[in-house]
A protein has these predicted regions:
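Membrane-proximal helix-loop-helix units in multi-pass membrane proteins
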Residues: 84-150
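Membrane-interface helix termini and inter-helical loops of multi-pass transporters
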Residues: 25-35, 86-95, 192-194
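Juxtamembrane boundary at the C-terminal end of a transmembrane helix
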Residues: 183-194
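Membrane-interface helix-boundary motifs at transmembrane edges
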Residues: 1, 57-69, 117-125, 165-175
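N-terminal topogenic module of multi-pass integral membrane proteins
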Residues: 1-79, 83
Length: 194
């Protein structure tokens, strides 16, 4: 069963990579107005959706090792689909940019192992889930240069992250409370990365 899930993750990643590059390489006016207004072309080029997908793959895996393997294979297959489309359909291959994403994909192996514990019990699980929600919060809202929304889709992504990492009410309040300083620190350390 785990092998079937892993194959599904690989196929999903590859298809998402091809879809992302197809959207990215298509004129925006071919899409319905709603898709244009939601700015899906750029949404997939920012980090929030990938953080959310990696979190989902991690926390719903059977073990921390399986979370690492599935998340890593998702990102590698997504990059394969993205850059194969880029090379063979669009006729170019940005190697330096590709290498940056490959390095991030390797990092996800270790990060996913830790994220698997976010749905667990206790203080460590609350801290991990707070960090995830905080990073998603930092992707959705500006906290350091006035409070405003960066992008609507990132707000939706943050809200979905809250739903999947929801805990008992008392723990949930702590989780959300801790996520705010995480978001603030994130924006102070890497203000424009996302």
């Amino acid at each position: 069963m785990q092998m079937i899930v892993t194959v599904g993750v690989i196929l999903f990643g590859f298809a998402l990579g091809v879809l992302q590059k197809w959207i990215d390489g298509s004129p925006s006016n071919i899409f319905p107005l709603l898709i244009q207004q939601l700015d899906l072309r750029n949404y997939f080029g920012r980090f929030a959706i990938w953080i959310l997908l990696a979190t989902c793959i991690s926390i719903y895996s059977k073990s921390p090792l399986r979370a690492s393997i599935n998340t890593f294979l998702f990102f590698i297959s997504m990059l394969a689909g993205y850059y194969l489309y880029c090379n063979y359909v669009l006729g170019f291959l940005p190697k330096a940019y590709m290498m940056m994403w490959v390095m991030i994909s390797f990092a996800t192996f270790f990060i996913a192992y830790i994220c698997w514990y976010a749905k667990g019990e206790g203080v460590i699980a609350i801290i991990i889930s707070s960090a995830i929600i905080g990073v998603l919060f930092a992707q959705a809202f500006s906290l350091t240069q006035g409070f405003y929304v960066y992008h609507l889709m990132e707000v939706v992504t943050w809200f979905i992250g809250i739903i999947i990492l929801y805990r008992k009410p008392k723990e949930f309040v702590i989780e959300l409370g801790l996520s705010v300083p995480v978001a603030l620190i994130y924006q102070l350390v890497i203000p424009y990365w996302g």
